[in-house]
Amino acid sequence: MSNRFSDNKQVGVVATFAELVNTHFQESTNALCWHRNLDGDFEEIVSKLQLKENITEVSTDELLTLQLSEKGIAAREIILNDLQLLTDFGASPSLNLLKCYERDEEFDFISTDVYSWHVDRSPVGTDTFLCTYYGAASDIIPNDEVLQKILIPEIREKLKELHDGPESEFEDFLKENYFDLHYQAKPNAQPVNLGLGHLWRLAVDHPEQKVLPCVHRAPVEKGECRLLLIC
């Protein structure tokens, strides 16, 4: 399958949902992409949904009440099918109309919001699934092109000052505040934009994980809402 992800060692490309959920992550591959060119007017759906807050969860019932053109109906069917596939798989997908995420501006030397390069963590075996139907799309980055922020000396020193407790409790402090999940891109790093319409499965940091978790970030919105499926 020829596409812009084919030669990327971090990304495995599949042609079906079954392949997406059954293919194992291995070596440096910690992101799987069900590559799709979707036919439908997702912008029409966004224009007819009501943004109630910065992140508005859209229910199936809300989708079904929209009066749409033929292209809009096609887009809705794709979304409903994706939601059903993931639900049948045992996931808990959420469709979000998104203006922006909350920013973490508490400290000037480290941020723990989703606009920062980060990994997801879970106490049980799971993966992150996401698909952007409209708007700016997320990025991923190879693990060897980032540095864990807590290992950067000047950041680590400031975190130790912030901790102000016994050295033996410092690592727990980092985990409890999610500082250890965040990364900084190295100079000349080459992030990969996930694009529109593809359904992605990203590796999560959990006890049974065989590969490094996928480092990713939310995009800065371009003044328009995003329509995002995530679980």
Locate the predicted segments by residue:
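Solvent-exposed alpha-helices and their adjacent loops that cap or buttress functional pockets
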Residues: 24-25, 122-124, 221
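Catalytic core of non-heme Fe(II) oxygenases with the double-stranded beta-helix
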Residues: 111-189, 195
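Short, surface-exposed beta-edge/turn micro-motifs
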Residues: 28-31, 126-129, 197, 225-226
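N-terminal auxiliary "cap/dimerization" subdomain that precedes the catalytic jelly-roll/cupin core
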Residues: 1-90
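Short helix/loop capping segments that flank catalytic or ligand/cofactor-binding pockets
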Residues: 43, 140-142, 210-211
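Catalytic core of Fe(II)/2-oxoglutarate
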Residues: 176-231
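Extracellular-facing segments of soluble proteins and assemblies that are Gly/Ser/Thr-biased and enriched
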Residues: 70-120
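Short, structured patches in soluble enzyme cores that scaffold and shape functional sites
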Residues: 97-99, 131-134, 142, 204, ...
